[in-house]
A protein has these predicted regions:
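Conserved mixed alpha/beta catalytic, RNA-binding, or beta-rich assembly cores of soluble enzyme
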Residues: 1-72, 86, 92, 107, ...
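N-terminal cationic-hydrophobic initiation segments that often serve targeting/anchoring roles
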Residues: 72-73, 101
Length: 149
């Protein structure tokens, strides 16, 4: 990787829009070169842009993410990281990777952003509890959601 490589992050539209996630853990680990960004530690990347996915349901038309990805590619990104929440929750992630990879084979696609002490199953359960209790992603991130919430 060259110094100053331009990367993009795709976050989950539901987590970002419906649950008010500001991507703070993603950005924290980007800046600290942790999680999926650890491989960039010798040549810190430049975050060229962040977008949300195309939203659910995209089973019938997953290609709609390509318009959003096009906005990143126009700025010459070389790598796209899919956020932790997408890796943990998105039933369309592999389809997105297939479609983006076919259209933009020069762009590296990496599953994940930040480190989490929660398993994907625990994360999904906490998000489910947060949704039922009208909480947001900050409640999940800051661990204000428990099995008893």
């Amino acid at each position: 990787m060259n110094s100053g490589e331009k990367i993009g992050i795709i976050t989950c539209a539901n987590a970002t829009i419906e649950m008010d996630c500001c991507a703070a853990p993603c950005l924290r680990d980007l800046n600290a070169h942790l999680g999926s960004f650890a491989e960039h530690h010798e040549n810190p990347p430049i975050l060229a842009g962040m977008i949300t996915c195309a939203g659910c349901p995209t089973l019938a038309y997953p290609e709609k993410i390509m318009r959003k990805v096009g906005a990143l590619v126009e700025f010459e990104i070389t790598t796209i990281h899919f956020s932790y929440c997408m890796v943990a929750m998105c039933p369309f992630l592999n389809k997105y990777i297939e479609i983006i990879g076919k259209e933009h084979p020069h762009v590296r696609l990496i599953k994940g952003t930040h480190v989490s002490s929660l398993s994907h199953e625990q994360f999904r359960e906490y998000v489910n509890i947060a949704c039922k209790n009208q909480m947001n992603m900050n409640d999940v991130i800051k661990r204000r959601v428990t099995e008893r919430s």
